[in-house]
Curated annotation (Swiss-Prot):
PROSITE patterns: AA_TRANSFER_CLASS_2 (PS00599). It comes from the Bacteria. It is an enzyme of class 2 (transferase). GO terms for biological process: L-histidine biosynthetic process. The modification N6-(pyridoxal phosphate)lysine is found at K209. Pathway: Amino-acid biosynthesis; L-histidine biosynthesis; L-histidine from 5-phospho-alpha-D-ribose 1-diphosphate: step 7/9. This is Histidinol-phosphate aminotransferase. It catalyses: L-histidinol phosphate + 2-oxoglutarate = 3-(imidazol-4-yl)-2-oxopropyl phosphate + L-glutamate. The gene is hisC. GO terms for molecular function: histidinol-phosphate transaminase activity; pyridoxal phosphate binding. It holds the Pfam family Aminotran_1_2. It comes from Geotalea uraniireducens (strain Rf4) (Geobacter uraniireducens). Its EC number is 2.6.1.9.
Length: 347
């Protein structure tokens, strides 16, 4: 018998959103990818790296990427670590701060991959639910677990916790408070300033969503230098290849392109939300590049299948607390108009 660790043998593993073999055959609104291509400067930077240099190892520290992020966010480079997607940062935070048997916690519902990463480490998982007005339910005055993950804006719902509340949490969490800002660029709010004020605050970011680089796997964390030093100890030593590093620098450097893409997505999101309400769908006001919406009959599976039959992919969760609704990524205006036409047909 294969001698798997007990915690690995009993875990189910994370199930990502459906990826069709031919994405071009669908309107793909199920994994919160950006509706628009990356900046042309990104493509130029990648092509400039293709050639003789590929036989050489990349910069193990991703210094150019750290410096670009530091300039953008107003930190010194030693406060930044670059990663193979923000998932690598989340994984390494648990490896660095949670021993086997320690507790980590997160908001439910949010990114269930936190639980998967904790299970790999052998840590215990606790979740805190939400009240009807999007507050944390039954959260203690002092949380003594090793890490508390806060996705802001929340996914799948899209609402945001206020900066004041996040600062309050920083004082109530004894361990590390990790603010996962995967979708923060669509909201305009950030907790980055709290990193300077509280030694236990880490902010994670990704270039997958707002910078259109999901296919490159690029993320980063902003934290105190001593936290970054710990993450540097355990990350893969060549975690970003040459192409990814070049893409990161170019993407972060082209803020005009970035801002225009975000503007168009937010504008389409607000239009789509208003159109859904005309069909009597309930829509949670969203600060991400997606909306969580519930049809009048609360049968999310029925609407999901109707859209799937029309080659429109959205996200339906089997979780009974989410199965009544759908999370729909925001595509181009044309894609969302076609989606609305399909929803009118489905009824």
């Amino acid at each position: 018998m294969i001698p798997l660790r007990k915690n690995i043998a009993r875990m189910a593993g994370y199930v990502p959103g459906y990826q069709p073999e031919d994405p071009a055959a669908y309107i793909k609104l199920n994994t919160n990818e950006n509706a628009y291509p990356p900046s042309p400067k990104v493509l130029e930077a990648i092509m400039a790296e293709v050639g003789e240099g590929l036989r050489r190892y990349p910069d193990a520290a991703s210094r150019a990427g750290r410096e670009a992020a530091a300039r953008l966010y107003g930190f010194l480079p030693e406060w930044i670590v670059m990663a193979n997607g923000s998932d690598e940062v989340l994984n390494n935070l648990i490896r660095a701060f949670a021993d086997e048997g320690d507790e980590i916690a997160y908001v439910y519902p949010s990114y269930s991959y936190y639980a998967t990463l904790a299970e790999i480490q052998g840590a215990r998982v606790k979740t805190y639910g939400l009240t009807d007005d999007w507050k944390l339910a039954n959260f203690p005055e002092r949380y003594d677990g090793k890490i508390f993950f806060l996705t802001n804006p929340n996914a799948p719902y899209g609402f945001t916790f206020s900066r004041e509340f996040i600062e309050e949490l920083a004082g109530r969490v004894a361990g590390m408070l990790v603010v996962d800002e995967t979708y923060a660029d669509f909201a305009g709010d950030t907790a980055l300033d709290l990193v300077r004020k509280y030694e236990n605050v880490v902010v994670t970011r990704t270039l997958s969503k707002s910078y259109s680089l999901a296919g490159m796997r690029l993320g980063l964390a902003v934290a105190r230098p001593e936290v970054i030093a710990a993450l540097d100890k355990i990350r893969d030593h060549y975690n970003l290849d040459r192409l990814a590093q070049a893409a990161a620098v170019a993407a972060l450097g082209d803020q005009d392109y970035f801002r225009e893409a975000v503007r168009k997505i937010c504008e389409t999101r607000d239009w789509f939300s208003a159109e859904l309400r005309k069909l009597r769908y309930s829509v949670i006001p969203s600060s991400g590049n997606y909306v969580f919406t519930t049809p009048p009959d609360r049968d999310g599976a029925r609407v999901y299948q109707g859209l799937f039959d029309r080659k429109i992919l959205v996200r339906h969760f089997s979780d009974p607390n989410l199965a009544h609704g759908l999370r729909i990524s925001i595509g181009t205006r044309e894609e969302m108009e076609k989606t609305m036409e399909a929803l009118r047909e489905i009824g």
